[in-house]
């Protein structure tokens, strides 16, 4: 086929390599034309020009040019602050038939900084209109990322942002429900730390919703073994602090003693700071004393009795 090359775009149906048409020069020219049209207050004409080019790049398997066209289309809408056009362009380009993975990912990653402040906060806004647009953009990007493995990280971030927005509006139940939609433990592209942090947020909001049955289920997704690893101390403390809330509701003194002892025994962040380890050890002793007699309670009692820090605790009156 004249004017075509076999590129790195992968195999098409039937195992044949897709043919790639190099549209880089045409893309350079038409992007420049589109920018000039926008400078002349002709956004619709610029988007129409780029839409036709987007199809040629997509059908011609020129992914590099396709990504540039998609990014430019969104950027031009943002440049003139046409929020309606931006949302529509985003939706249209992301849902094109046989749209390339690279294009969808580029669209989402281009738009996210306009509604997200790293790492998981909604974009700071000064007007209600800006706030409403950011909320719409977060929802649109979440919808686009739904079910796409290559956008797992982005979907997790967007979900955290949406939950934060709802929590700030005072709707804890809705915030908890939003986070529960994402089974982050199955996301292969997220690090262990990212997964644990997300699950801890699920726990916090579920407890805030006072759904203790769900909170227990979510807590079961956290590997205690992972919490013992290096650089996980912060998450270990957060986890067992949340568990104290759960076990207080459950009125389980022995589990509370174990929770506080897990906090107390965290190296670095707790054991090196008397202001932190002393309250944790004191709570351990109190709840252990309130625990019903049993083998586990007695074993833990003997272990605590041999701790030299016990002598540093103030007497309880």
Segments (PLM) and residue ranges:
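Extended alpha-helical scaffold regions
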Residues: 1-317
């Amino acid at each position: 086929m004249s004017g075509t090359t076999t590129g790195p775009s992968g195999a098409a149906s039937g195992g044949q390599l897709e043919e790639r048409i190099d549209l880089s020069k045409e893309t350079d020219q038409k992007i420049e034309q589109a920018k000039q049209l926008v400078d002349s207050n002709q956004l619709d004409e610029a988007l129409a020009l780029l839409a036709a080019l987007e199809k040629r790049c997509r059908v011609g398997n020129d992914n590099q040019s396709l990504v540039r066209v998609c990014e430019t289309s969104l950027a031009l809408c943002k440049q003139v602050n046409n929020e309606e056009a931006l949302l529509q362009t985003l939706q249209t380009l992301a849902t094109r038939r046989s749209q390339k993975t690279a294009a969808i990912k580029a669209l989402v990653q281009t738009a996210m900084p306009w509604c997200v402040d790293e790492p998981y906060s909604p974009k700071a806004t000064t007007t209600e209109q800006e706030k409403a647009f950011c909320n719409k953009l977060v929802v649109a990007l979440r919808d686009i990322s739904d079910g796409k493995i290559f956008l797992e990280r982005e979907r997790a971030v967007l979900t955290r942002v949406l939950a934060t927005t709802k929590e700030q509006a005072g709707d804890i139940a809705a915030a908890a429900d939003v986070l529960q939609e994402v089974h982050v433990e199955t996301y292969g592209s997220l690090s262990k730390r990212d997964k644990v942090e997300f699950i801890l947020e699920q726990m916090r909001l579920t407890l805030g919703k006072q759904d203790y049955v769900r909170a227990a289920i979510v807590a079961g997704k956290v590997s205690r073994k992972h919490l013992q690893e290096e650089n996980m101390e912060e998450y270990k403390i957060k986890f067992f602090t949340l568990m104290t809330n759960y076990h207080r509701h459950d009125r389980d003194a022995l589990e509370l003693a174990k929770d506080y002892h897990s906090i107390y025994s965290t190296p670095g962040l707790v054991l090196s700071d008397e202001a932190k380890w002393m309250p944790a050890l004191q709570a351990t002793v109190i709840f252990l004393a309130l625990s019903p007699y049993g083998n586990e309670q007695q074993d833990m009692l003997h272990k605590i009795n041999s701790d030299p820090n016990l002598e540093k605790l103030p007497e309880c009156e």
